[in-house]
């Protein structure tokens, strides 16, 4: 009995001659290696189908090429090799290749004062394209932080001043009395509203960069804002966090400008756009600001 040849329907001609901009797979579960640590990720992989007479692509070839991601540290060079393999396995069919990797980047972050540390998750998307020998990599990173409203802080200070006048009117001021008052509930009769906020960064990397500057970018963003969300804390850390918020009062406009100026100085960045969202505790809506640099709209 002769062995039957398995049919390859994708290699057949299409009944409708029409090229397609993108064909591939989305949501592929796989491990990737970042900073020499394996991480669970999801990948979208595809190519253009430029041969309009071809019925389809060979998705299994894309899938198998992704095995390279679990074998070595994720770098722009590795991404380019994978995309080139996409194209080599579809010679005559495709001229462009695309790969997106999504994961939560886990970084251990130190406390502000104490020796404690804890893990913080940063949603990350890495997008790579190869077309006509032109290679591009873009990063999308979410950076959480705390924002305290400058207007609310001014109003709170005014209420504290008024309370001070009421409590010390027509009284000689004694250092010990004022110090005790400042440490009492009357001394903090009002507090400004603050909220957890988020900076969504979309960055285009230089074409010939050797490494993905993930940690450096996150550090630059958090240093510019000054109020990074914390992990494990003691009371001394919480006090330092309160001080950081008081010294970095921010509208969403302030946060966007700080990030813009900081990211311009970050090495390896060719262009970026960003969006900051302050999930207002005063209002039922968000305060939002956007900014970009060297980015074609």
From Swiss-Prot:
Reaction(s) this enzyme catalyzes, per UniProt: GTP + H2O = 7,8-dihydroneopterin 3'-triphosphate + formate + H(+)
GO molecular function, one term: GTP cyclohydrolase I activity
Record keywords: Hydrolase
Gene3D superfamilies: Urate Oxidase
Keyword Hydrolase included in the entry's annotation: yes
Site label May be catalytically important, positions: 149
Pathway assignment: Cofactor biosynthesis; 7,8-dihydroneopterin triphosphate biosynthesis; 7,8-dihydroneopterin triphosphate from GTP: step 1/1
Any one Pfam family match given in the protein's UniProt record, by short name: GCHY-1
InterPro entries linked: GTP_cyclohydrolase_FolE2 (IPR022838), GTP_cyclohydrolase_FolE2/MptA (IPR003801)
Coiled coil: none
GO biological process: tetrahydrofolate biosynthetic process
E.C. numbers: 3.5.4.16
Function, in words: Converts GTP to 7,8-dihydroneopterin triphosphate.
Family: Belongs to the GTP cyclohydrolase IV family.
NCBIfam families: PRK13674.1-1
UniProt protein name: GTP cyclohydrolase FolE2
Species of origin: Pseudomonas fluorescens (strain ATCC BAA-477 / NRRL B-23932 / Pf-5)
Taxonomic lineage of the native organism: Bacteria, Pseudomonadati, Pseudomonadota, Gammaproteobacteria, Pseudomonadales
């Amino acid at each position: 009995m002769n062995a039957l040849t398995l049919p390859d329907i994708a290699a057949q001609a299409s009944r409708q001659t029409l090229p397609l901009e993108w064909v591939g797979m989305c949501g592929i579960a796989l491990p990737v290696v970042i900073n020499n640590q394996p991480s669970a990720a999801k990948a979208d992989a595809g190519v253009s189908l430029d041969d309009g007479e071809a019925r389809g692509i060979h998705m299994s070839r894309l899938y198998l090429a992704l095995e390279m991601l679990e074998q070595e540290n994720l770098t722009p060079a590795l991404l380019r090799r994978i995309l080139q393999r996409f194209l080599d396995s579809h010679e005559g069919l495709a001229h462009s290749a695309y790969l997106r990797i999504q994961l939560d980047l886990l970084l251990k972050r130190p406390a502000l004062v104490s020796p404690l540390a804890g893990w913080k998750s940063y949603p990350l998307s890495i997008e790579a394209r190869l077309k006509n020998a032109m290679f591009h990599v873009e990063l999308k990173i979410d950076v959480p932080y705390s924002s305290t409203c400058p207007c609310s802080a001014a109003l709170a200070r005014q209420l504290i001043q008024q309370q001070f006048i009421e409590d010390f009117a027509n009284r000689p001021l004694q250092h010990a009395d004022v110090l005790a008052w400042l440490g009492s509930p009357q001394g903090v009769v009002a507090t400004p509203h603050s909220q957890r906020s988020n900076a969504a960064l979309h960055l285009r990397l230089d074409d010939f960069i050797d490494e993905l500057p993930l940690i450096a970018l996150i550090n630059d963003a958090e240093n510019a804002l000054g109020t990074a969300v914390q992990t494990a804390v003691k009371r001394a850390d919480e006090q330092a966090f309160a001080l950081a918020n008081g010294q970095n009062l921010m509208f969403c406009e302030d946060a966007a400008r700080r990030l813009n100026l900081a990211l311009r100085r970050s090495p390896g960045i060719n262009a970026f756009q960003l969006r900051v969202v302050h999930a207002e505790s005063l209002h039922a809506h968000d305060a939002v600001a956007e900014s970009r640099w060297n980015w074609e709209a």
